[in-house]
From Swiss-Prot:
Enzyme class, UniProt record, top EC level: ligase
Taxonomic placement: Bacteria, Pseudomonadati, Pseudomonadota, Betaproteobacteria, Burkholderiales
Protein's recorded name: Lysine--tRNA ligase
GO BP annotations, alphabetical order: lysyl-tRNA aminoacylation
Superkingdom, taxonomy of origin: Bacteria
InterPro entries: Aa-tRNA-synt_II (IPR004364), aa-tRNA-synth_II (IPR006195), aa-tRNA-synth_II/BPL/LPL (IPR045864), Lys-tRNA-ligase_II (IPR002313), Lys-tRNA-ligase_II_N (IPR044136), Lys-tRNA-synth_II_C (IPR018149), NA-bd_OB-fold (IPR012340), NA-bd_OB_tRNA (IPR004365)
Gene name, Swiss-Prot/TrEMBL: lysS
Natural source organism: Burkholderia mallei (strain ATCC 23344)
Subunit structure: Homodimer.
Cellular component aspect of the GO annotation: cytosol
Residues that bind Mg(2+) 1: 418, 425
UniProt catalytic activity: tRNA(Lys) + L-lysine + ATP = L-lysyl-tRNA(Lys) + AMP + diphosphate
């Protein structure tokens, strides 16, 4: 473990001294029998008071004499002889307490002067406006509800260390308004999506998190063991195959918002545990899905932010405009126009070009790759990162789309799309393959790839084939990455910024 630097050691020593002093204060409270009371009920919240009485002047407030009870964390304290002020932050915002010994009593006032920033405090009093115009609570009763033993970060610098922000999210939420705003926007976006789906007659369902066979995506699963059944289980990588079983069962529109788990790397776009929404609608296809997904994302932005025009990393993005649609080769030639049609159909050229771009074409996934898979790999290297405006990339090759319906007009191509915004995949959808014999053949091909060393290739799911053999209506299905969508809406450069508790290395 790395030894702390001299400044770090000094800070730690100072903090230890502060904690020791605060523990002494807590010990005194315990001796008095008033350490952690639990009998205070707020009648108002800071933001509600600030909003409702924003335009009320001092005379109007004095005439109204509104009694309030407010509780929260003390973020700032100014002791000024016979009158003191405290800025208190609750879950909605901040409001000022005005404290005098004449109003709360000399004993309470003396105790208040010893309270620390970070303490949870409560007051009853009358709402008024100070001579400087600050909306405040003139306290007639003041109590300490919970003692903070650890000091808050310096109010001018906050949490400067990014990893500490993620590791101690509870502190980050206390001191960083932008973090609180991000997660409120996330909640609004998800609520918007749920309402949008309900209004479109979708039924929300829950499917298993523990799978006997991982499926529904090309990914490496987490493996666990069920002791009572003595069987290997997998944390789900996707709910797709279970949701389509429900389509077979007669639920014609279903969706699920829940966690997926993939035992893969961590990056600004990837976390091993992440939130997805998948939805399936009978008697639809990928064209319907694209239109529906576009409207859903636009509405989520409006409900979360109040507008469909957003800013991401300094650039404006108008989600109200129609989303673009390009095939894989069209996208390559738009952003790398030197490639000819002939080159993009030449196996040897594509492999050579991928190698030149730093792709390891000897890995198992490339050993038997066809033209379509090679084109997709080239797209990922040359075009994907440049898809700033919302763009549906359509018509994916069948060899990388084992669950998607093949095109009726172009051999080797499926009715599949992926949606990219700001160079990042947000959604993936397709007309579902509902032919059980074709699906079984594709599963067998996936098993061959897995046997050849491709860890992300799919397993053969015999029960899913059995479900298809009962007959599944024509269906469209789509998955939307909720975390990546929230990144977009909140101008967050990394997925860790939109996860309350992202995965990190152990502290030791």
């Amino acid at each position: 473990m790395t030894e702390p630097t001299q400044p770090q050691a000094a800070v730690a020593a100072d903090e230890n001294q502060i904690v020791a002093e605060r523990r002494d204060k807590l010990r005194a409270l315990r001796d008095q029998g008033i350490a952690y009371p639990n009998d205070f009920q707020p009648t108002h919240h800071a933001a509600g008071l600030q909003t409702e009485y924003a335009d009320a002047d001092k005379e109007a407030l004095d005439a109204k004499a509104l009694d309030v009870a407010v509780a929260g964390r003390m973020m700032l304290k100014r002791v000024m002889g016979k009158a003191s002020f405290a800025t208190v932050q609750d879950g909605s915002g901040q409001i000022q307490f005005f404290v005098t010994p004449a109003d709360v009593g000399a004993e309470t006032y003396d105790a208040f002067k010893k309270w620390d920033l970070g303490d949870i405090v409560a007051a009853r009093g009358v709402l008024f406006r100070t001579n400087k115009g600050e909306l405040s609570v003139k306290c007639t009763e003041l109590r300490l509800l919970a003692k903070a033993l650890r000091p808050l970060p310096d109010k001018f610098h906050g949490l400067a260390d990014q990893e500490t922000r993620y590791r101690q999210r509870y502190v980050d939420l206390i001191v960083t308004p932008e973090t609180r705003a991000t997660f409120r926007a996330r909640t609004k976006a998800i609520a918007s999506i749920r309402k949008f789906m309900s209004d479109a007659d979708f039924m929300e369902v829950e499917t298993p998190m523990l799978h006997p066979i991982p499926g529904g995506a090309a990914a490496k699963p987490f493996v666990t063991h069920h002791n009572a059944l003595d069987m290997q289980m997998f944390l789900r990588i996707a709910p797709e195959l279970y949701l389509k079983r429900l389509i077979v069962g007669g639920f014609e529109r279903v969706f699920e918002i829940n966690r997926n788990f993939r035992n893969e790397g961590v990056s600004p776009r990837h976390n091993p545990e992440f939130t997805m929404m998948e939805f399936y609608a009978a008697y639809t296809d990928y064209r319907w899905l694209m239109d529906f997904t576009e409207r859903l994302i636009r509405q989520a932005a409006v409900d979360a932010l109040g507008t469909a025009t957003i800013r991401y990393q300094g650039r404006e993005l108008d989600l109200a405009k129609p989303f673009h649609r390009l095939t894989i080769t069209q996208a390559i030639q738009k952003y790398a126009p030197n490639y000819t049609d002939g080159q993009l159909s030449d196996d040897a050229f594509l492999r050579g070009e991928l190698k030149r771009l730093g792709v390891d074409v000897t890995q198992p996934a490339f050993l038997n790759a066809g033209i379509g898979a090679l084109q997709l790999a080239l797209f990922e290297e040359t075009a994907e990162a440049q898809l700033w405006e919302p763009t549906f990339i359509i018509d994916y090759p069948i060899e990388v789309s084992p669950l998607a319906r093949e095109s009726d007009t172009v051999a080797g191509i499926t009715e599949r799309f992926e949606l990219f915004v700001t160079g990042r995949e947000i959604a993936n959808g397709f007309s579902e393959l509902n032919d059980p014999e074709d699906q079984a053949a594709r599963f067998r091909k996936q098993v061959e790839q897995k046997d050849a060393g491709d860890e992300e290739a799919m397993f053969f799911d015999a029960d899913y084939i059995r479900a298809l053999e009962y007959g599944m209506p024509p269906t469209g299905g789509c998955g939307i990455g909720i975390d990546r969508l929230v990144m977009l809406l909140t101008d967050s450069p990394t997925i860790r910024d939109v996860l309350l508790f992202p995965h990190l290395r152990r502290e030791d």
